[in-house]
Protein backbone atom coordinates (compact mmCIF):
# COMPACT_ATOMS: atom_id res chain seq x y z
CA UNK A 1 0.00 0.00 0.00
CA UNK A 2 1.26 3.46 -0.89
CA UNK A 3 2.33 5.55 2.10
CA UNK A 4 1.16 9.15 2.13
CA UNK A 5 1.20 12.11 4.45
CA UNK A 6 -1.14 15.06 4.74
CA UNK A 7 0.45 18.22 6.10
CA UNK A 8 3.42 15.96 6.87
CA UNK A 9 1.40 13.65 9.14
CA UNK A 10 1.10 9.99 8.10
CA UNK A 11 -2.37 8.87 7.04
CA UNK A 12 -3.84 5.46 6.31
CA UNK A 13 -5.19 4.84 2.81
CA UNK A 14 -8.32 2.69 2.67
CA UNK A 15 -9.60 0.77 -0.32
CA UNK A 16 -8.12 -1.23 -3.17
CA UNK A 17 -4.85 0.12 -4.51
CA UNK A 18 -4.93 0.34 -8.31
CA UNK A 19 -2.04 -0.32 -10.67
CA UNK A 20 -1.32 0.22 -14.35
CA UNK A 21 -2.94 -2.61 -16.31
CA UNK A 22 -5.90 -3.01 -13.95
CA UNK A 23 -9.40 -2.81 -15.37
CA UNK A 24 -10.77 0.48 -14.04
CA UNK A 25 -13.53 -0.29 -11.54
CA UNK A 26 -16.81 1.51 -11.92
CA UNK A 27 -17.95 3.93 -9.23
CA UNK A 28 -20.92 6.18 -8.52
CA UNK A 29 -20.46 9.84 -7.58
CA UNK A 30 -22.66 12.94 -7.72
CA UNK A 31 -22.31 15.89 -10.10
CA UNK A 32 -22.97 19.56 -9.29
CA UNK A 33 -26.67 19.10 -10.10
CA UNK A 34 -26.95 16.22 -7.60
CA UNK A 35 -27.27 13.64 -10.38
CA UNK A 36 -25.52 10.29 -10.09
CA UNK A 37 -22.59 9.80 -12.46
CA UNK A 38 -20.54 6.65 -13.07
CA UNK A 39 -17.25 5.97 -14.78
CA UNK A 40 -19.20 4.04 -17.43
CA UNK A 41 -20.99 7.26 -18.39
CA UNK A 42 -17.73 8.18 -20.13
CA UNK A 43 -17.02 4.81 -21.80
CA UNK A 44 -15.24 5.15 -25.12
CA UNK A 45 -13.30 8.22 -23.97
CA UNK A 46 -9.91 8.61 -22.34
CA UNK A 47 -10.59 9.61 -18.73
CA UNK A 48 -8.08 11.66 -16.78
CA UNK A 49 -9.29 11.37 -13.19
CA UNK A 50 -7.88 14.18 -11.07
CA UNK A 51 -8.42 13.55 -7.37
CA UNK A 52 -8.16 16.38 -4.85
CA UNK A 53 -8.66 16.52 -1.07
CA UNK A 54 -10.72 19.73 -1.32
CA UNK A 55 -11.29 21.83 -4.41
CA UNK A 56 -11.18 25.13 -2.51
CA UNK A 57 -7.47 25.05 -1.59
CA UNK A 58 -4.59 26.49 -3.58
CA UNK A 59 -2.94 23.26 -4.76
CA UNK A 60 -6.28 21.61 -5.54
CA UNK A 61 -7.41 24.70 -7.42
CA UNK A 62 -4.21 24.77 -9.48
CA UNK A 63 -4.48 21.04 -10.18
CA UNK A 64 -8.07 21.36 -11.38
CA UNK A 65 -7.35 24.37 -13.56
CA UNK A 66 -4.14 22.97 -15.07
CA UNK A 67 -5.59 19.59 -16.02
CA UNK A 68 -8.70 21.18 -17.53
CA UNK A 69 -6.63 23.64 -19.57
CA UNK A 70 -4.11 21.03 -20.77
CA UNK A 71 -6.66 18.34 -21.59
CA UNK A 72 -8.83 20.71 -23.61
CA UNK A 73 -6.28 20.21 -26.41
CA UNK A 74 -6.61 16.42 -26.35
CA UNK A 75 -9.02 14.52 -28.57
CA UNK A 76 -11.55 12.16 -27.02
CA UNK A 77 -10.40 12.99 -23.48
CA UNK A 78 -12.45 14.06 -20.48
CA UNK A 79 -11.11 15.34 -17.16
CA UNK A 80 -13.06 14.23 -14.10
CA UNK A 81 -12.15 16.08 -10.91
CA UNK A 82 -13.25 14.14 -7.84
CA UNK A 83 -13.29 15.24 -4.20
CA UNK A 84 -15.52 14.76 -1.17
CA UNK A 85 -16.60 18.40 -1.29
CA UNK A 86 -20.34 18.89 -1.44
CA UNK A 87 -21.65 19.44 -4.98
CA UNK A 88 -22.77 22.95 -3.99
CA UNK A 89 -19.20 23.92 -3.03
CA UNK A 90 -17.88 22.47 -6.29
CA UNK A 91 -20.43 24.44 -8.29
CA UNK A 92 -19.57 27.66 -6.45
CA UNK A 93 -15.84 27.08 -7.03
CA UNK A 94 -16.31 26.48 -10.78
CA UNK A 95 -18.33 29.69 -11.10
CA UNK A 96 -15.81 31.74 -9.10
CA UNK A 97 -12.86 30.34 -11.07
CA UNK A 98 -14.46 30.80 -14.48
CA UNK A 99 -14.47 27.07 -15.27
CA UNK A 100 -18.16 26.40 -15.90
CA UNK A 101 -17.39 23.41 -18.14
CA UNK A 102 -15.10 21.63 -15.68
CA UNK A 103 -16.56 18.29 -14.59
CA UNK A 104 -16.43 18.17 -10.81
CA UNK A 105 -17.80 15.12 -9.05
CA UNK A 106 -18.46 14.53 -5.37
CA UNK A 107 -17.67 11.27 -3.58
CA UNK A 108 -19.14 12.59 -0.32
CA UNK A 109 -22.02 10.12 0.01
CA UNK A 110 -20.38 6.73 0.27
CA UNK A 111 -16.76 7.10 -0.92
CA UNK A 112 -17.52 4.75 -3.83
CA UNK A 113 -14.65 6.13 -5.91
CA UNK A 114 -12.17 6.52 -3.07
CA UNK A 115 -12.57 2.97 -1.83
CA UNK A 116 -12.53 1.47 -5.35
CA UNK A 117 -9.24 3.25 -6.11
CA UNK A 118 -7.61 3.01 -2.66
CA UNK A 119 -7.33 6.74 -1.97
CA UNK A 120 -9.52 7.35 1.09
CA UNK A 121 -7.50 8.96 3.89
CA UNK A 122 -9.10 7.15 6.82
CA UNK A 123 -8.23 9.66 9.52
CA UNK A 124 -9.56 12.65 7.56
CA UNK A 125 -12.35 11.14 5.41
CA UNK A 126 -10.82 12.98 2.46
CA UNK A 127 -9.39 11.65 -0.79
CA UNK A 128 -5.62 11.58 -1.24
CA UNK A 129 -4.27 13.74 -4.05
CA UNK A 130 -3.89 11.39 -6.99
CA UNK A 131 -4.26 11.01 -10.74
CA UNK A 132 -5.50 8.07 -12.79
CA UNK A 133 -5.66 7.83 -16.56
CA UNK A 134 -8.10 5.29 -17.98
CA UNK A 135 -7.97 4.54 -21.70
CA UNK A 136 -11.03 4.24 -23.93
CA UNK A 137 -11.04 0.46 -23.39
CA UNK A 138 -11.35 0.90 -19.61
CA UNK A 139 -7.79 -0.01 -18.63
CA UNK A 140 -5.77 2.04 -16.15
CA UNK A 141 -2.69 3.28 -18.03
CA UNK A 142 -1.33 5.74 -15.45
CA UNK A 143 -1.51 6.12 -11.68
CA UNK A 144 0.02 8.56 -9.26
CA UNK A 145 -0.77 8.87 -5.59
CA UNK A 146 1.09 11.99 -4.46
CA UNK A 147 3.19 11.11 -1.36
CA UNK A 148 2.50 14.43 0.43
CA UNK A 149 -1.01 15.81 0.14
CA UNK A 150 0.12 19.41 -0.16
CA UNK A 151 2.42 18.67 -3.14
CA UNK A 152 1.45 18.88 -6.80
CA UNK A 153 1.06 15.80 -9.00
CA UNK A 154 3.28 15.26 -12.04
CA UNK A 155 1.14 17.16 -14.53
CA UNK A 156 3.38 16.45 -17.51
CA UNK A 157 3.46 12.67 -16.96
CA UNK A 158 -0.31 12.46 -16.57
CA UNK A 159 -1.00 14.55 -19.69
CA UNK A 160 1.53 12.51 -21.66
CA UNK A 161 -0.20 9.29 -20.53
CA UNK A 162 -3.56 10.70 -21.65
CA UNK A 163 -2.08 11.62 -25.05
CA UNK A 164 -0.75 8.08 -25.52
CA UNK A 165 -3.96 6.43 -24.31
UniProtKB/Swiss-Prot annotation:
InterPro entries: Redoxin, Thioredoxin-like_sf, Thioredoxin_domain, TPX, Tpx_CS, Tpx_Peroxidase_subfamily
UniProt keyword Oxidoreductase present: yes
Entry GO MF terms: thioredoxin peroxidase activity
Keywords: Antioxidant, Disulfide bond, Oxidoreductase, Peroxidase, Redox-active center
CDD domains, sorted: PRX_Atyp2cys
Keyword Protease set for record: no
One Pfam family cited in the UniProt record for this chain: Redoxin
Disulphide bond pairs: 60-94
Residue stretches making up the Thioredoxin domain: 18-164
Catalytic center residues: 60
Catalysed reaction, written as an equation: a hydroperoxide + [thioredoxin]-dithiol = an alcohol + [thioredoxin]-disulfide + H2O
EC number, UniProt record: 1.11.1.24
Classification via Gene3D superfamilies: Glutaredoxin
Class of the enzyme per the UniProt entry, highest EC level: oxidoreductase
Subunit structure: Homodimer.
UniProt function note: Thiol-specific peroxidase that catalyzes the reduction of hydrogen peroxide and organic hydroperoxides to water and alcohols, respectively. Plays a role in cell protection against oxidative stress by detoxifying peroxides.
Note: The active site is a conserved redox-active cysteine residue, the peroxidatic cysteine (C(P)), which makes the nucleophilic attack on the peroxide substrate. The peroxide oxidizes the C(P)-SH to cysteine sulfenic acid (C(P)-SOH), which then reacts with another cysteine residue, the resolving cysteine (C(R)), to form a disulfide bridge. The disulfide is subsequently reduced by an appropriate electron donor to complete the catalytic cycle. In this atypical 2-Cys peroxiredoxin, C(R) is present in the same subunit to form an intramolecular disulfide.
Family membership: Belongs to the peroxiredoxin family. Tpx subfamily.
Entry protein name: Thiol peroxidase
Organism encoding this protein: Listeria monocytogenes serotype 4b (strain F2365)
Amino acid sequence: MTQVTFKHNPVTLVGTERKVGDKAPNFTVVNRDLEEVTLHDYDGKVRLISVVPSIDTSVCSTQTRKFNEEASNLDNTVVLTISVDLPFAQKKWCAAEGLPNAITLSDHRDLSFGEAYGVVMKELRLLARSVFVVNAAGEIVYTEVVPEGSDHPNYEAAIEAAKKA
